[in-house]
């Protein structure tokens, strides 16, 4: 069946030429991102368990988790946790199939423990966190929609949509690169740099201002003087990363709420504000491209934790982003591209109600010149939509 792919030209000012642009990222140790990461790690673990036992992924959604802040007493040289962080795992998972009981709660708790150990090495998992799994079972009608049919494309679990865009702007690129640099390189040299980092980017004309909140781990920081040295180091390193991706002026402001005189600063025991006063929820942070982009169309769906078989809130957000990025790479003449995929509940996921593509051609290029190439890329990605499922299960696609 021919797919309903609609491609239209946009008539608007390109984002890079607009006066104001805002971009945000909540890094791995932010409470909202912790919730996202736990939810996704549980979904992946359930997928592996189902595949091992039954050769197929069974119905589940773990996209409703909460991180409830604990209480701590940080101090230079090393503080302590007073009350543990509470993690609530809820959602739905198939617990019995063909007479076999699946230990879904055990799988979920183990996955959460493993994920927290990986991203928050300063957190004592035996003492400083409580993990409570309250997974239920799904509604009968949605489980019926989910039922795999041999050789058939899965049917949409909902009437919903996914959104993606490309290419990334200077500010978007800077924030993604800064987060990756700190997580993969800088923290290895300086373990005092905590995992709870929030980066807010403002571009006002040709000036980019990065406002960064970064937790410092108290046991690796002796006093307020050393804390200030870390602030100077981070400001310098972030500035270096930023300037690799733009010719614009870059200003870095770090931990702007600090009061150095009274020593009231962003100091933590574990590297995350979830240890005291900051709760987290799945879906309240980054979109599947790792960013929050109010200048762009966005879906409000939580991508993390949703099943990767037929949950449109996951599949179409990932797929629309993939389509936009692939089109930018392969088709010359695209300034900006936005993709929106809309499903109908119960219909095959490779047949969206509409695949809407909005293109801002570069100067001197008409939509007619590039329409055919874009159409082919969209159609091919929809025909191979189940590849998204495989990539998600293997952990190859990020969801936040």
From Swiss-Prot:
ATP binds at residues 136-141. It catalyses: L-methionine + ATP + H2O = S-adenosyl-L-methionine + phosphate + diphosphate. Gene3D superfamilies: 3.30.300.10, S-adenosylmethionine synthetase, C-terminal domain. One of its GO terms (molecular function) is ATP binding. It is an enzyme of class 2 (transferase). GO terms for biological process: one-carbon metabolic process; S-adenosylmethionine biosynthetic process. Its EC number is 2.5.1.6. Transmembrane segments: none annotated. InterPro entries: AdoMet_synthase_2_family, AdoMet_synthase_3, S-AdoMet_synthetase_arc. Its cofactor is Mg(2+). Keywords: ATP-binding, Magnesium, Nucleotide-binding, One-carbon metabolism, Transferase. Disulfide bonds: none annotated. Pathway: Amino-acid biosynthesis; S-adenosyl-L-methionine biosynthesis; S-adenosyl-L-methionine from L-methionine: step 1/1. Catalyzes the formation of S-adenosylmethionine from methionine and ATP. Belongs to the AdoMet synthase 2 family. PANTHER family: S-ADENOSYLMETHIONINE SYNTHASE (PTHR36697:SF1). This is S-adenosylmethionine synthase. The lineage of its organism: Archaea, Methanobacteriati, Methanobacteriota, Stenosarchaea group, Methanomicrobia.
């Amino acid at each position: 069946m021919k797919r309903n792919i609609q491609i239209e030209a946009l008539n608007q000012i390109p984002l890079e030429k607009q006066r104001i642009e805002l971009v945000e990222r909540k890094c791995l140790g932010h409470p909202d991102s912790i919730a996202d990461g736990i939810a996704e790690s549980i979904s992946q673990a359930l997928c592996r368990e189902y595949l091992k036992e039954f050769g197929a992924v069974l119905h589940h959604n773990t996209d409703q988790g909460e991180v409830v802040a604990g209480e701590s007493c940080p101090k230079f040289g090393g503080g302590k946790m007073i009350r543990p962080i509470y993690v609530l795992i809820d959602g739905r998972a198939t617990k019995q199939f063909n007479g076999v009981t699946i230990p879904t709660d055990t799988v979920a708790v183990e996955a959460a423990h493993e994920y927290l150990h990986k991203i928050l090495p300063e957190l004592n998992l035996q003492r400083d966190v409580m993990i409570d799994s309250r997974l239920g079972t799904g509604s009968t009608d949605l489980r019926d929609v989910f039922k795999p049919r041999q050789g058939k494309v899965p049917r949409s679990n909902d009437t919903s949509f996914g959104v993606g865009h490309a290419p990334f702007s200077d500010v978007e690129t800077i924030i993604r690169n800064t987060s990756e640099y700190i997580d993969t390189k800088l923290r290895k040299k300086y373990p005092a740099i905590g995992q709870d980092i929030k980066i807010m980017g403002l571009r006002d004309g040709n000036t980019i201002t990065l406002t960064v909140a970064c937790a410092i781990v108290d046991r690796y920081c002796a006093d307020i003087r050393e804390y200030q040295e870390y602030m100077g180091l981070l400001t310098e390193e972030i500035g270096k990363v930023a300037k690799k991706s733009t010719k614009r002026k870059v200003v870095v402001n770090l931990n702007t709420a600090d009061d150095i005189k009274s020593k009231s600063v962003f100091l933590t025991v574990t590297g995350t504000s979830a240890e005291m006063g900051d709760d987290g929820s799945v879906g309240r942070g980054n979109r599947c491209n790792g960013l929050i982009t109010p200048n762009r169309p966005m879906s409000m769906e939580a991508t993390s934790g949703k099943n990767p078989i037929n949950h449109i809130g996951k599949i179409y957000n990932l797929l629309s982003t993939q389509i936009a990025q692939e089109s930018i790479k392969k088709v010359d003449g695209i300034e900006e591209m936005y993709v929106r995929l809309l499903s109908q509940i119960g219909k095959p996921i490779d047949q969206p109600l509409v695949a809407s593509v909005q293109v801002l051609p570069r100067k001197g290029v008409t939509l007619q010149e590039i329409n055919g190439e874009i159409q082919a890329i969209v159609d091919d990605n929809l025909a191979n939509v189940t590849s998204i499922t495989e990539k998600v299960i293997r952990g190859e696609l990020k969801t936040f």
